[in-house]
């Protein structure tokens, strides 16, 4: 221990005077190679009544290191003769810049921060996992296939030409940069499976970005697009999940099966003049509409729509909006038919469904058949609702909707209330479990099973 006569400026050089560290190891999340990481911070604290002189702070692999540090505003792989005054501290900032590893799988990158002082060397491990990627920036492509090997990163846009098809195989991962879009003038064929879904997400893959919406643009379908299919896709954390620009003469066809679209800063699906057929789908949490259908023909069977809003706060508009005109320019969008059956539509506000007409005299072919809904328009538009159930918000519907777990609670209103004939059209739920085995199917994308 330091004696009473010790001065704050005295250099404490005996080995028993030690630093305190804010962490025992520096861990980075999985990182894309050749892309800088976020910064990790280490605090070195001197708890003593005199000054500690650090001979050197260095990265063990020196010039071969995949990391770089910054101390007192100076970047490099080594810093010498660093003083830490009594009861004071310094901060070390570390970033990773990983080289390509030339394999499809993750590779671990390990280094150590070596702190030499008072005739001793102390070590803090630095660990990260690097993933090589295939990058697309401003590309316009004819037909090609994305496989489950290296992830693909879209930095600006990837455009598929009219008459051509982008095929995405099971287990493939597409990561999009801020404001980047996947633009389809031709066709998109997504071939995921339950065990190996296709992922569309942000290229910020650190844990702190996992639920942040608005990190990339959208999957955009242009007028010439046709014959689009999604099977077991996960689309998350964008501005819009699907943005569909069809025309009345040739609506854009999109089939969605066993697909989740969630956590959007604007809309999960915003479609003009489209033909959307969806079954066993989950659309969850958007700050504007979850589902905006302007014109076209649509069918949603055994699907779950839930909206508690995403980070940033939702606007107080209904989750499901149906109209026979464009919300963008108010041009007519002929609405031929919209049918929801054995589906759930709930959310944070009192009215989660609304139907808008261009003229007060317009009558739209809209039906909510045997659905569980949260709405205030049922009395005004009774003809839209056929055998549907009003949601009782005092009951637990899902196991944990705040954790995006939309499997049914033990006492869920949706249990055993599905229409059997409708269930026969989609006999297995999102997980492949039979919903007709007990002849009492549940409403929504998931059949209840005790866990």
Predicted regions and their residues:
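Contiguous beta-strand segments of beta-sheet-rich domains
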Residues: 56-59, 107-109
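C-terminal motif of bacterial Sec signal peptides marking the signal peptidase cleavage site
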Residues: 3-5
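Short, solvent-exposed loop/linker segments at beta-strand-coil boundaries, enriched for Pro/Gly
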Residues: 60-78
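Short acidic/proline- and small/hydrophobic-mixed sequence motifs that coincide with surface turns
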Residues: 37-38, 49-54
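Beta-strand/loop edge motif enriched in small/polar residues
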Residues: 9-13, 19-30, 35-37, 41, ...
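Asparagine-centered strand-capping/turn motif at beta-strand->loop junctions
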Residues: 44-48
């Amino acid at each position: 221990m330091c004696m009473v006569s010790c001065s704050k400026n005295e250099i404490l050089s005996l080995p028993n005077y030690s630093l305190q560290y804010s962490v025992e190891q520096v861990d980075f999340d999985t990182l894309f190679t050749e892309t800088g990481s976020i910064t990790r911070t280490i605090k070195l604290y001197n708890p003593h009544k005199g000054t500690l002189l650090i001979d050197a702070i260095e990265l063990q692999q020196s010039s071969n290191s995949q990391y770089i540090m910054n101390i007192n505003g100076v970047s490099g792989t080594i810093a010498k003769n660093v003083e830490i005054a009594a009861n004071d501290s310094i901060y070390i900032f570390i970033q990773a810049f990983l080289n390509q590893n030339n394999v499809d799988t993750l590779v671990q990158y390990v280094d150590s921060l070596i702190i030499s002082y008072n005739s001793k060397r102390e070590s803090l491990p630095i660990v990260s996992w690097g993933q090589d990627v295939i990058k697309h920036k401003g590309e316009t492509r004819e037909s090609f296939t994305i496989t489950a090997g290296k992830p693909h990163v879209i930095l600006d846009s990837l455009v598929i030409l009219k008459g051509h098809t982008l095929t995405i195989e099971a287990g493939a991962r597409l990561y999009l940069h801020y404001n980047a879009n996947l633009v389809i003038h031709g066709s998109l064929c997504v071939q995921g499976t339950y065990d190996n879904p296709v992922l569309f997400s942000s290229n910020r893959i650190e844990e702190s970005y996992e639920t942040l919406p608005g990190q990339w643009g959208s999957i955009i379908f242009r007028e010439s697009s046709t014959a689009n299919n999604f099977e077991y896709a996960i689309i998350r954390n964008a501005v819009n999940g699907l943005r569909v620009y069809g025309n009345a003469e040739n609506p854009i066809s999109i089939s969605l099966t066993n697909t989740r679209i969630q956590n959007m800063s604007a809309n999960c699906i915003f479609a003009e003049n489209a033909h959307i057929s969806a079954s066993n789908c989950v659309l969850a949490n958007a700050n504007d509409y979850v589902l905006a259908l302007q014109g076209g023909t649509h069918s949603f069977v055994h699907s779950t729509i839930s909206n508690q809003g995403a980070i940033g706060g939702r606007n107080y508009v209904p989750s499901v909006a149906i109209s026979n005109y464009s919300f963008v320019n108010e041009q007519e969008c002929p609405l031929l038919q919209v049918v929801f059956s054995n589906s759930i539509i709930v959310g944070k506000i009192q009215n989660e469904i609304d139907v808008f007409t261009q003229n007060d005299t317009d009558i739209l072919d809209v039906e909510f058949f045997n659905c569980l809904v949260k709405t205030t328009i049922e009395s005004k538009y009774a003809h839209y609702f056929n055998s549907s159930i009003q949601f009782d918000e005092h009951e637990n519907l899902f196991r944990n909707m705040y954790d995006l777990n939309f499997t049914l609670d033990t006492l869920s209103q949706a249990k055993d209330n599905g229409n059997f004939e409708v269930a026969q059209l989609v006999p297995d739920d999102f997980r492949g479990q039979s919903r007709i085995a007990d002849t009492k199917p549940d409403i929504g994308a998931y059949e209840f099973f005790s866990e």
